[in-house]
Amino acid sequence: MYERGAFVADHVEPVADDQIQPNGVDLTVDAVLEQTEPGRIDTDGKTIGDRSPVTPTADEDSTDTTVTIQPGTYILQYAETITIPENHVGFVYPRSSLMRNSCMLHSAVWDAGYTGRGEGLFEVHHEITIARGARVAQLVLATGDHENTYDGSYQHERTDTRPGE
C-alpha cells in the first residue's frame, strides 16, 4: 500500500507545500549530467563512468537557470535529500509533463534505510529546456516487509554526512 503524500513529505528535505501530492512528493532538478566515459559492473564491484554537467544558461525571460538538452541519455540529479524509512520501499516515477514532452525518467528501487540525494536515468527524445528546481519526478513510499535496511555504497550520496569521511 502506498503512503499518503504528507507521510512521504516527512522524509524529504527540503520540501515546499506545492511539492506535496496526494500520494507522494515531487522531486526537483538539481543538475543534469552527461556520461563521458564508460563504466563497469563486475561480480565483485562497480565503477561509475566519468560525467560532466550539461552547461546551464540564464533564461532571458525569467530568473531561472535552465539547461537545454538535446536528444540522448543523461543522468538527472535530484535536489532533495530523501530518507526511506524502515518498513518502506521508495519508487520514483516521472511526472506526466516529461512524458508529454517526449522524455522519460527511470529509477531503481530505493531500499529502506537509504538516505541521500539520488539520481535517475533521463532519456530525452526531443529537445527540451528544463529549469533548475523544476518538478520532474514523484517519490512514493510503499510499505515493505524486509529484514535489513540499506547499507550500500550509495548511502548518503551527495550529502554532507557520508560515513567514514
Swiss-Prot record:
- State which Enzyme Commission number(s) the record gives: 3.6.1.23
Basic and acidic residues bias spans? 39-49
Q: Which reaction does it catalyse?
A: dUTP + H2O = dUMP + diphosphate + H(+)
Keyword Transmembrane listed? The answer is no
Which Pfam families does the annotation name? DCD (PF22769)
* Top-level division of the source organism's lineage: Archaea
GO terms of biological process kind: dUMP biosynthetic process; dUTP biosynthetic process
Give the metabolic or biological pathway: Pyrimidine metabolism; dUMP biosynthesis; dUMP from dCTP (dUTP route): step 2/2
* Residues making up the signal peptide according to the UniProt record: none
| Assigned keywords, A-Z | Hydrolase, Nucleotide metabolism
Tell me its family: Belongs to the dCTP deaminase family. Archaeal dUTPase subfamily.
**The protein's role, per its UniProt record:** This enzyme is involved in nucleotide metabolism: it produces dUMP, the immediate precursor of thymidine nucleotides and it decreases the intracellular concentration of dUTP so that uracil cannot be incorporated into DNA.
The name on file for this protein is Probable deoxyuridine 5'-triphosphate nucleotidohydrolase
Q: Which organism is it from?
A: Halobacterium salinarum (strain ATCC 700922 / JCM 11081 / NRC-1) (Halobacterium halobium)
This protein's gene is called dut
